[in-house]
């Protein structure tokens, strides 16, 4: 209603996204499972022994892991991909890895989170199907990307003369996409 009261000619919505929590059994109700966003925004406390699930494959995971390593946490990053930070560019990955390994990170590739059950984290190798149970985790951090926060766009659609939805509120992707969309919209109007 506040937006409508302004009687805008054009509304550009860029309300972002929220962390995506996949339907992994037990993850959504696990009291010690938090998102990488929670780590970076410091909205939740983090234990000493951290298991980090990097499903997204971007810098969100490596940045949050490095942030925790700088606090003296023991961090292990597990990913279903062939490498942690799979989508990090070839010129950026070597210095990221150098910093992480220099701070004591452990990494395991081709493992995915299968379930969280009564304090036990269950991982599965994506090739062999072998499952392992982990009971040595104080905090489980996950990074599965985002879910569009587009409620404002949907509420205003059809109620203003022109409306554009950009960035993660349109679809969670990289910062480059958000900048490109915002540039396109700015040139359009």
Task: Cite the ranges covered by each PLM segment.
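A Rossmann-like FAD-binding core segment of flavoenzymes
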Residues: 1-21, 28-31, 35-48, 70-155, ...
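A conserved FAD-binding loop/helix module that cradles the flavin
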Residues: 54-67, 71, 82-92, 151, ...
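Short helix/loop capping segments that flank catalytic or ligand/cofactor-binding pockets
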Residues: 21-22, 61
């Amino acid at each position: 209603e506040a937006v409508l009261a302004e009687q805008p000619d054009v509304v550009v919505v860029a309300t972002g996204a929220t962390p995506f929590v996949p339907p992994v059994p037990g993850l959504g109700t696990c009291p010690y499972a938090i998102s990488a966003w929670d780590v970076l925004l410091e909205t939740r406390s983090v234990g000493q022994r951290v298991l980090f699930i990097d499903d997204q494959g971007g810098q969100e995971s490596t940045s949050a892991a490095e942030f925790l390593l700088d606090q003296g946490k023991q961090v292990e990053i597990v990913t279903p991909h062939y490498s942690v930070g799979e989508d990090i560019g070839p010129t950026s990955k070597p210095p990221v890895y150098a910093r992480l390994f220099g701070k004591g990170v452990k990494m395991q590739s081709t493992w995915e989170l299968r379930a969280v059950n009564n304090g036990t984290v269950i991982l599965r190798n994506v090739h062999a199907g072998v499952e392992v149970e982990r009971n040595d985790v104080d905090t489980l951090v996950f990074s599965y990307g985002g879910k569009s926060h587009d409620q404002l766009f949907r509420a205003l659609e059809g109620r203003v003369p022109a409306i554009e939805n950009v960035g993660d509120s349109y679809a969670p992707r990289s910062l480059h996409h958000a900048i490109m969309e915002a540039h396109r919209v700015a040139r359009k109007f």
